[in-house]
Amino acid sequence: MKHDSFIAREGIPFIIAFGLTTLLAVFFLEQSWIAVLPLTATLFTCWFFRNPERHTPEGEKLIVSPADGKVIRIDEDFHHEMLSQPCSKVSIFMNVFNVHVNRVPYSGKVTKISYSPGRFLSANLDKASEQNERNAILVRTSDGKEIMTIQIAGLIARRIVCWVREEDVVKRGERFGMIRFGSRLEVFMPKETKILVTVGEKVKAGESPLGTF
């Protein structure tokens, strides 16, 4: 199923509910101005679940950001149990105002997806990486390299959505999921990757280069 509509489908039930509430308020309440409240909620929900087009840059070895947000940490010699070799890790914090649709950082085949239940600490805390609810997507590239993305729920975000499955072939910049309301994404890249971002830098999903190898 495609996920290229302007509004992410996960937001449709909320938009319908608020929209119907607005109509009921207009037609059945004497003080119809009250309809402004659900109307505002409807418009905010449309904005929150926006799913804009992105233009992914060219470059065979380029790894792009999986999320809109701010780079909050970079580790250039990291070990993770799901990866066979040491790696570099870039952590990105998404606030409630960012686009929440996530995109594939590099083309390849999804070899493993691992969901872990957990807590809902603020996603900008380092311990959220290990303690919060999270979903790891491991992709093997055509030349055998491993690139992994982990979706991490935050203090408010309590719904991780992942649209891809194991054995799926994915393309860099393709939409693969979303997390509602402020969260964190971490990208694990081959250790030899040249990191192209710095801590504090703002990035866009599917467009901003994170690294190249």
Curated annotation (Swiss-Prot):
It catalyses: a 1,2-diacyl-sn-glycero-3-phospho-L-serine + H(+) = a 1,2-diacyl-sn-glycero-3-phosphoethanolamine + CO2. The keyword Kinase does not apply. Heterodimer of a large membrane-associated beta subunit and a small pyruvoyl-containing alpha subunit. GO terms for molecular function: phosphatidylserine decarboxylase activity. This is Phosphatidylserine decarboxylase proenzyme. It is found in: Cell membrane. Belongs to the phosphatidylserine decarboxylase family. PSD-A subfamily. One of its GO terms (biological process) is phosphatidylethanolamine biosynthetic process. It is a peripheral membrane protein. Transmembrane segments: none annotated. Pfam families: PS_Dcarbxylase. Its EC number is 4.1.1.65. It comes from Syntrophus aciditrophicus (strain SB). Catalyzes the formation of phosphatidylethanolamine (PtdEtn) from phosphatidylserine (PtdSer). InterPro entries: PS_Dcarbxylase, PSD-A. NCBIfam families: PRK05305.1-2, PRK05305.2-5. Keywords: Cell membrane, Decarboxylase, Lipid biosynthesis, Lipid metabolism, Lyase, Membrane, Phospholipid biosynthesis, Phospholipid metabolism, Pyruvate, Zymogen. Pathway: Phospholipid metabolism; phosphatidylethanolamine biosynthesis; phosphatidylethanolamine from CDP-diacylglycerol: step 2/2. One of its GO terms (cellular component) is plasma membrane. It is an enzyme of class 4 (lyase). Is synthesized initially as an inactive proenzyme. Formation of the active enzyme involves a self-maturation process in which the active site pyruvoyl group is generated from an internal serine residue via an autocatalytic post-translational modification. Two non-identical subunits are generated from the proenzyme in this reaction, and the pyruvate is formed at the N-terminus of the alpha chain, which is derived from the carboxyl end of the proenzyme. Signal peptide: none annotated. The keyword ATP-binding does not apply. Its cofactor is pyruvate. PANTHER family: ARCHAETIDYLSERINE DECARBOXYLASE PROENZYME-RELATED (PTHR35809:SF1).
